[in-house]
């Protein structure tokens, strides 16, 4: 996924109210940008860190600049939580998930379960329906190990419950963790920050829900899914 138009460099001053951040470009005055991420962004919000912004020439937007990338531990990290679905589709189409090959149709945002929407529903005349949920990942504490979640996620736990029900109906259900950074070789569940999610992950795994993780190359030119990473489940 290319950034068009190109991104603009800046320095982060602070993030607040989840959706907003104050930033500074060169010798310009401090100004406010939108943050397309409602999560904690643990470990990514460091004052004076290098960041990159996208520009949106839209009169309906209150803030025309939007935070896209932050630099953390000398690595570029994508923080836009609206991108993982696009990246997931690229990963499927580029053959990074051969387990999902062969489906004729990929439907987006389909209703299922109890007041939920699945990110992707894969359908075929021969293959069983496959319900695919996508999660954004950008949290790292240990070297080379990406983790999810970075805070308690009741919504994420509910999604696992819904996927378990799908498997019980004789269909395929899968969770794809899209890692918007390259400095990792493995992925794991962050059990200390959300034990409930960890237990539900274990139950889903035993129930037959499929789990995959893909990392991305992040640059100021674009973000691209590049490799599968192993999922560690201790």
Curated annotation (Swiss-Prot):
Pfam families reported in the protein's UniProt record: SfsA (PF03749), SfsA_N (PF17746)
InterPro entries, sorted: SfsA (IPR005224), SfsA_C (IPR040452), SfsA_N (IPR041465)
Gene Ontology MF annotations: DNA binding
Record-linked CDD domains: SfsA-like_bacterial
PANTHER family (alphabetical): SUGAR FERMENTATION STIMULATION PROTEIN A
Family: Belongs to the SfsA family.
Name of this protein: Sugar fermentation stimulation protein homolog
């Amino acid at each position: 996924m290319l950034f068009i138009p190109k991104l603009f460099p800046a320095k982060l001053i602070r993030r607040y109210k989840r959706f907003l951040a104050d930033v500074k470009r060169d010798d310009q005055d401090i100004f406010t940008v939108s943050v397309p991420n409602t999560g904690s962004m643990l470990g990514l919000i460091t004052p004076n860190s290098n960041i990159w912004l996208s520009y949106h020439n839209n009169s309906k937007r209150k803030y025309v600049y939007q935070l896209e990338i932050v630099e953390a531990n000398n690595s570029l990290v994508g923080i836009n939580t609206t991108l993982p679905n696009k990246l997931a589709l690229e990963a499927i189409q580029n053959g990074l998930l051969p387990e999902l090959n062969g489906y004729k149709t990929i439907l987006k945002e389909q209703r299922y379960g109890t007041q939920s929407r699945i990110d992707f529903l894969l359908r075929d005349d021969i293959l069983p329906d496959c319900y695919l949920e996508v999660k954004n990942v950008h949290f790292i504490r240990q070297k080379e190990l990406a983790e999810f979640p970075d805070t308690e996620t009741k919504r994420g736990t509910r999604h696992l419950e819904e996927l378990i029900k799908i498997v019980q109906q004789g269909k395929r259900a899968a969770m794809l963790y899209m890692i918007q950074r390259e400095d990792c070789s493995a992925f794991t569940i962050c059990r200390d920050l959300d034990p409930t999610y960890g237990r539900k992950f274990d139950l889903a795994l035993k129930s037959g829900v499929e789990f995959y993780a893909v990392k991305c190359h992040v640059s100021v030119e674009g973000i691209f899914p590049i490799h599968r990473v192993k999922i560690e489940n201790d």
